[in-house]
C-alpha cells in the first residue's frame, strides 16, 4: 500500500514493566549494541515512544539533541528521567542483550502507558523505530487479517 509503514510486531507492556522489543527491529537498528537506548516521546497522533541509540543519533541531523544535552549524551541523568528539548522529551534506559527494556512507573506515567498495553513497533526512520500506543496505524493493525506477532 502507498506510504505503508513497516510493522515489526507488537510488544506487550508486562506486569513487571518490561517490554520485549521485536527481534527484527533490534537487528535493523542494532539496538542492543551499546547496552543503553534513548527513548523519546512519539508523535501526538501515535503516542508511545521512539527508540534509538547514541551511535545512530549522534552523527545524524538530530545529533544536536545530544550535543545540547551533555547529561543525556553521557547518560548522567537518572535512568528513565525525561529531559524536554524542542517539543519532545528524551531519556535513556538500559537494554538487555536479548532486547528487553525495563520501564519504571515514571516512564509509564509520563508516556500515558499502562500494563497490558500492546505497543505497535513501526519502522519510522533510519535513526529510530516507534513503539506506538494509539491512532490510525494501531486501528489499521487491529483490522489486519494477517498475523502480527506479539513479543
Annotate the PLM regions.
Residues 1-3, 28-32, 78-85, 107-114:
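Short, solvent-exposed secondary-structure boundary motifs
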Residues 14-30, 95-112:
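Short beta-strand-centered segments at strand-helix junctions
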Amino acid at each position: 500500500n502507498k506510504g505503508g509503514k513497516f510493522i515489526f510486531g507488537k510488544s506487550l507492556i508486562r506486569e513487571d514493566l518490561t517490554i520485549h522489543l521485536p527481534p527484527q527491529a533490534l537487528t535493523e537498528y542494532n539496538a542492543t549494541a551499546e547496552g543503553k537506548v534513548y527513548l523519546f516521546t512519539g508523535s501526538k497522533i501515535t503516542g508511545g515512544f521512539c527508540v534509538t541509540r547514541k551511535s545512530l543519533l549522534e552523527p545524524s541531523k538530530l545529533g544536536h539533541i545530544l550535543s545540547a544535552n551533555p547529561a543525556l549524551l553521557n547518560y548522567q541523568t537518572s535512568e528513565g528521567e525525561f529531559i524536554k528539548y524542542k517539543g519532545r522529551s528524551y531519556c535513556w534506559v538500559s537494554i538487555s542483550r536479548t532486547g528487553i527494556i525495563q520501564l519504571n512507573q515514571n516512564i509509564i506515567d509520563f508516556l500515558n502507558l499502562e500494563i497490558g498495553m500492546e505497543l505497535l513497533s513501526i519502522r519510522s526512520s533510519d535513526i529510530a523505530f516507534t513503539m506506538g500506543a494509539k491512532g490510525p496505524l494501531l486501528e489499521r493493525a487491529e483490522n489486519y487479517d494477517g498475523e502480527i506477532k506479539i513479543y
